[in-house]
């Protein structure tokens, strides 16, 4: 029998409430987090019938990783989210778990290629990794080994509220391809999409420890054929997981390129400890991804990093949007310390949804990201604080108090004599507690310094400084947009070609800010600070 998850049952199991207080210390006010319990990777991102679906790795029974299920939230604007009942609940939850639902993706099967649709209803189909903690014979008659990871599907006929697992034939991709079948414990994270040109479904999965991606095609989402492999290339410091494959416009025109994203854990960007996400630009013909020559580097220590900070991982893209509207969401945490961050009764938040595009920057095709939230509804029209300085002398100047949730737009001349220019954020009145976001002129790097950001006691690697390359724009200016929430800072540099995302855990009264120029004066400075209101109200 297929397994139907009734919303009323799951609602009771997961403890979903209609009214909830989202005002706990460190609770992000415009970043999604579950009401309670553990969350990690975003899954099944799908825009369908005017609704954005965000599924996510979720433990319905506690604040640490375990009992992994698919949580679910919906939004009409990528800003205001409503948590829904658990979509896929770990099989056997409450007694002996025999199957967990690891990361995956979802599509709307508008042509009913799967045959799951009934009475004219479009089936939504989720493809995910089944993790089997014990060896067993499945309802499909297939046998699996202890700790096996396989790819399975489920479908929904009520726009994603309840799901039926395809027990008659799951898993639909039971094992890694030959000659990699010994990797059955590390074969995961399918990203599925419809490829218009070939009129086929395509899925890319990770053979994690080999730093390889396997690409399959299908006519019906049930029967899959291996068509190519990708990797290993570039960063290989940890396992490859949570891959993506999607097409984006180039320079806002009709030309397009394809992008592969892949998470690494550990082995993130230089200067970080733990997880990170790299990307490749190239061409995809429906079966094979061919990377551009300048997107692949000799050796395995250099990469194109999607984010240069420590807290952006498992980034996933939305199906159901045009390529010009492509949106990604990343998990704003890090496996190095994610289980120990000082939040309760939840752990983890998602980064700001980001609009992705490709632009030619410094003669190279580059992934650029910009915040996609509906800012007009939550951001103040008039700035809390606005100043311009033709010359900002060496030293510091206090800005007005900023509160806990705000956006800073900061620009200045790259020809300044200063060594660094920064803004101290979420600072105490005496600035012994602060987070610094700024620019190193000699190195041409953005930096984010959280060494004195508040509570850093839970992990000995947390109090660190992070850097990302940023060349000044064609007018000789450096431009930063900085989004601050109660427990996070996200820096978007230039056109979005460099981003830095980091969690912080400051004191409640750390609401001060100041501008700091070191080693000389900074020229042509402009700073604007806008308040951002809570999306939970």
Curated annotation (Swiss-Prot):
This is Extracellular exo-inulinase inuE. It is an enzyme of class 3 (hydrolase). GO terms for molecular function: fructan beta-fructosidase activity; sucrose alpha-glucosidase activity. Its EC number is 3.2.1.80. Residues 1-19 form the signal peptide. It comes from Aspergillus ficuum. GO terms for cellular component: cytoplasm; extracellular region. Belongs to the glycosyl hydrolase 32 family. It holds the Pfam family Glyco_hydro_32N. It is found in: Secreted. PROSITE patterns: GLYCOSYL_HYDROL_F32. Glycans are attached at residues 49, 67, 112, 300, 363, 398, 430, 531. Gene3D superfamilies: Exo-inulinase, domain 1, Glycosyl hydrolase domain, family 43.
């Amino acid at each position: 029998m297929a397994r139907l998850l009734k919303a009323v049952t799951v609602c009771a199991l997961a403890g979903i409430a209609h009214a909830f207080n989202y005002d706990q210390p460190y609770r992000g006010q415009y970043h999604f987090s579950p009401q309670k319990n553990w969350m990690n990777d975003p899954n099944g991102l799908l825009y369908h019938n005017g609704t954005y679906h965000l599924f996510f790795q979720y433990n319905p029974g506690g604040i640490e990783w375990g009992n992994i299920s698919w949580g679910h939230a919906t939004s009409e604007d990528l800003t205001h989210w409503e948590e829904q009942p658990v979509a896929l609940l770990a099989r056997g939850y409450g007694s002996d778990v025999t199957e967990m639902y690891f990361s995956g993706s979802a599509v709307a099967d508008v042509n009913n290629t799967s045959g799951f649709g009934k009475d004219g209803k479009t089936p939504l189909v989720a493809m995910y990794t089944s993790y089997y903690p014990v060896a067993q014979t499945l309802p499909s008659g297939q046998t699996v080994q202890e700790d096996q990871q396989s790819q399975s599907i489920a479908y929904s006929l009520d726009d994603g509220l309840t799901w039926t697992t395809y027990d008659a034939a799951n898993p639909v991709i039971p094992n890694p391809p030959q000659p990699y079948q010994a990797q059955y414990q590390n074969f995961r994270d399918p990203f599925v999409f419809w490829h218009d040109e070939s009129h086929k479904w395509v899925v890319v999965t990770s053979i994690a420890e080999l730093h390889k991606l396997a690409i399959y095609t299908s006519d019906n989402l049930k029967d899959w054929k291996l068509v190519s492999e990708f990797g290993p290339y570039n960063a290989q410091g940890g396992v490859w997981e949570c891959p993506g494959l999607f097409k984006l416009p180039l320079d806002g025109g009709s030309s397009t390129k394809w992008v592969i994203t892949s998470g690494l854990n550990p082995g993130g960007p230089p200067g970080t400890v733990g997880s990170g996400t790299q990307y490749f630009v190239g061409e995809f013909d429906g079966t094979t991804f061919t990377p551009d020559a300048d997107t692949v580097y000799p050796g395995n220590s250099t990469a194109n990093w999607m984010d240069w900070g420590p807290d952006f991982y498992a980034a996933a893209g939305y199906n159901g949007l045009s390529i010009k509207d492509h949106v990604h969401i990343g998990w704003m945490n890090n496996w190095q310390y994610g289980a120990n961050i000082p939040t309760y009764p939840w752990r983890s938040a998602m980064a700001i949804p980001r609009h992705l595009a490709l632009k030619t920057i410094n003669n190279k095709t580059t992934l650029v990201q910009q915040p996609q939230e509906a800012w007009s509804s939550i951001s103040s029209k008039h700035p809390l604080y606005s100043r311009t300085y033709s010359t900002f002398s060496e030293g510091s100047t206090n800005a007005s108090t900023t509160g806990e949730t705000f956006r800073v737009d900061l620009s200045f001349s790259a020809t300044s004599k200063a060594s660094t220019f920064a803004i101290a954020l979420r600072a105490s009145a005496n600035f012994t507690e602060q987070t610094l976001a700024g620019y190193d002129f000699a190195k041409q790097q953005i930096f984010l310094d959280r060494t004195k950001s508040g509570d850093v006691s839970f992990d000995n690697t947390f109090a660190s400084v992070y850097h990302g390359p940023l060349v000044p724009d064609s007018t000789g200016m450096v431009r930063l947009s900085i989004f601050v929430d109660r427990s996070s800072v996200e820096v978007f540099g230039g056109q979005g070609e460099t981003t830095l995302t980091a969690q912080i855990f400051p004191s409640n009264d750390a609401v001060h800010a100041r501008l700091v120029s070191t080693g000389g004066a900074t020229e042509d400075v402009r700073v604007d600070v806008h308040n951002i209101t809570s999306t939970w109200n």
